[in-house]
Every structure is written in C-alpha cells, then in structure tokens.
C-alpha cells in the first residue's frame, strides 16, 4: 500500500511542467527523494544530501533507489544508500545529483533566474521536451530517437515554432501562444 508521502513524491515527478528543487541545508531521506523527483536541482554551498534510511534498517521508500541511479550512476547510488552517509554540495555537483551549487546568499535569486529563463519559453514546447527527455529513462536509444523525431516533427507544425522563428529572425522576444 502506498503511503501519502510516496504519492506526493510521485505526483511531483508526474508534473508536466518543469520543476526545480532549491536546496539550502539538509536534504536527507525524503528530502533527498523530493529533490531527485525534480527536473533541476540547485543547492547552496552549505547543503548536504543523503539517504540515511539504512541506519534505521530501511531503504529509501519514495523512489530514490531508482532515480538516484539515473542521476549519479549505479556505484554512487549503492554507496549513498548502503553507507547512509551524507555528501556535501560540492560532491553532489561532481556526482551529478545537483545542476548548480551557489553561495547560500545567492541561492534564491539564482533559482529565480533559472526559473525565469525556463518560464520565458513556450509551455507547450517545454511539456513536449520534458516528455521526450523522460522517455530516455525507460526505453532504448533507437526507440527514444524515433519518439524525439516524431515530437520534433509535431512541434515543427506548431504555432509556437512559427513565433519562435519569427522572433529569432526579427531579433525580438517571442510572444508564445503555448500551442
């Protein structure tokens, strides 16, 4: 039976819009799993990450054993889960667990800046991009490339593609219709 927290983390993973985790401090256990469920993870230089459940006779229960493998690889996932030790933000960046590490005082603004860059794009195209990239987690390369090609072809006929090309040629910001 799934618990409320598992459902919440899965719901976060399933959001069709881009998600960003902003971590300032400890992201241990469920906190690390929530961060792993986001598309982009930004951490302060004082952040720590870990899956300490092994110290309680448990394993991560909200998807970390699966999502960490995709982020940091098999060996680092095994190390994190089996030792239960924390890693600092510098190691999290080096391992691929986070996208960026910034000074704590700059974390909020840096995260907002990334969100604004993403938010300035076509929401329709972002949704298709997220779906297409996610397919790489569950299917082979050949099938994934075919799905990407189909998504590209579909977007090529979209209103937002016309708007984007026109904006690029005219050297002005795009006014997306999100279609």
Which residue stretches match the model-derived regions?
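Short C-terminal tail/terminal secondary-structure segment
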Residues: 137, 173-179
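Extended, non-globular alpha-helical segments
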Residues: 1-11
């Amino acid at each position: 039976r799934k618990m409320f927290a598992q459902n919440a983390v899965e719901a976060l993973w399933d959001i069709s819009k881009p998600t960003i985790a902003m971590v300032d401090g400890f992201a241990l256990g469920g906190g690390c799993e929530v961060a792993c469920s986001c598309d982009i993870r930004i951490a302060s230089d004082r952040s720590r990450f870990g899956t300490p459940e092994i110290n309680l006779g448990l394993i991560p229960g909200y998807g970390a054993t699966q999502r960490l493998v995709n982020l940091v690889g098999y060996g680092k996932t095994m190390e994190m889960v089996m030792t239960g030790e924390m890693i600092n933000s510098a190691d999290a960046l080096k391992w691929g667990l986070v996208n960026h590490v910034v000074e704590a005082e700059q974390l909020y603004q840096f995260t907002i800046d990334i969100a604004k860059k993403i938010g300035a794009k076509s929401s329709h195209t972002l949704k298709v991009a997220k779906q297409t990239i996610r397919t790489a987690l569950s299917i082979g390369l050949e099938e994934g490339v075919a799905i990407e090609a189909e998504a590209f072809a579909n977007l090529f006929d979209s209103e937002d593609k016309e708007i984007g090309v026109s904006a690029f040629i005219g050297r002005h910001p795009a006014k997306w219709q999100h279609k």
